[in-house]
Amino acid sequence: MPAKRKPVLPALTITPSPAEGPGPGGSAEANLVDLQKKLEELELDEQQKKRLEAFLTQKAKVGELKDDDFERISELGAGNGGVVTKVQHKPSGLIMARKLIHLEIKPAIRNQIIRELQVLHECNSPYIVGFYGAFYSDGEISICMEHMDGGSLDQVLKEAKRIPEEILGKVSIAVLRGLAYLREKHQIMHRDVKPSNILVNSRGEIKLCDFGVSGQLIDSMANSFVGTRSYMSPERLQGTHYSVQSDIWSMGLSLVELSIGRYPIPPPDSKELEAIFGRPVVDGAEGESHSVSPWARPPGRPISGHGMDSRPAMAIFELLDYIVNEPPPKLPNGVFTQDFQEFVNKCLIKNPAERADLKMLMNHTFIKRSEVEEVDFAGWLCKTLRLNQPSTPTRAAV
């Protein structure tokens, strides 16, 4: 799909539920007219428009969320200070993902967090996970989101071992468009781009979740934040001013991880690369093989699935020191296209002023090529995760 073509959209038909009361800006109908205008500003294709319309129509029937209305189905994962479960919302019959965050905080702080999370109601994009609502109950904040049946890319990676470049092309497009939407339409940055915050589904959609919309929630969860710091940019780790350029570093680091099958710091040595790719892999301008890294493994990371990484675990401060002071990670030569290598290198420039920005990356050859490439993302995902593919086959939804 050409990036600049703006399709002519038929009017959105989102039916409000009779149970839905007037919003803060007036009647539900007036709110929907405003929403329709905002959606028509987005460059959506027909399929994206229909899916967003269907989600918003379903959401309009949900009404106020209450703890008693949910039936737990299974646990989806844990992280970022909360546990995510797959639930059914009994009044509507909808399947949702419910994130429970336990916080020992005063009522005023809790109410501020719930208020700040309401901004998520306005985040409607094919590249952002849908939001049903947030509420407080029994010492926990609940954030209810669209359920993505493919899970997160870190879960997909466990099954796939490595994710092919053409698939990562579609992932890169979705992440860039999601970041651009958050920045341009809501003036917010993500702050926590990593494989576990990129969700996918059997329809071929790729969406961002867990972005930093609530400053108060970020502050309240500061103590649980250490585990995500391995994706933070050098400037953020040093406590200096940071911007959306920091999200671009995190995306680049995530792409290297998804490409080679493990967190890329410290870099894999020649033996491990050979185990990963099944053949000797050379690197560097002179074509030298990867040298054996003297560095330990990063903290909390298992020994490589390829059995070659027997180094002791790296302490968290060693890892953060490495990110700030050592050369940035890169993709090995001879395995990936030059376009993809160059794209990743531009994301992982340590100086944020020299790092590529969103606009530059959207116009990069790797992205332009990936936009026109026919890739059956949904088919690949369903085969990898052994999911049932929806009856209507879809190409990558980006």
From Swiss-Prot:
One of its GO terms (molecular function) is ATP binding. ATP binds at L76, G77, A78, G79, N80, G81, G82, V83, V84, K99. Residues 1-29 are annotated as: Disordered. Belongs to the protein kinase superfamily. STE Ser/Thr protein kinase family. MAP kinase kinase subfamily. Activated by phosphorylation on Ser/Thr catalyzed by MAP kinase kinase kinases (RAF). It catalyses: L-seryl-[protein] + ATP = O-phospho-L-seryl-[protein] + ADP + H(+); L-threonyl-[protein] + ATP = O-phospho-L-threonyl-[protein] + ADP + H(+); L-tyrosyl-[protein] + ATP = O-phospho-L-tyrosyl-[protein] + ADP + H(+). It comes from Gallus gallus. Keywords: ATP-binding, Kinase, Nucleotide-binding, Phosphoprotein, Serine/threonine-protein kinase, Transferase, Tyrosine-protein kinase. Catalyzes the concomitant phosphorylation of a threonine and a tyrosine residue in a Thr-Glu-Tyr sequence located in MAP kinases. Activates the ERK1 and ERK2 MAP kinases. GO terms for cellular component: early endosome; focal adhesion; late endosome; mitochondrion. The modification Phosphoserine is found at S220, S224. Transmembrane segments: none annotated. The active site is at D192 (proton acceptor). This is Dual specificity mitogen-activated protein kinase kinase 2. One of its GO terms (biological process) is MAPK cascade. It is an enzyme of class 2 (transferase). Residues 70-367 form the Protein kinase domain. It comes from the Eukaryota. Its EC number is 2.7.12.2. Coiled coil: none annotated.
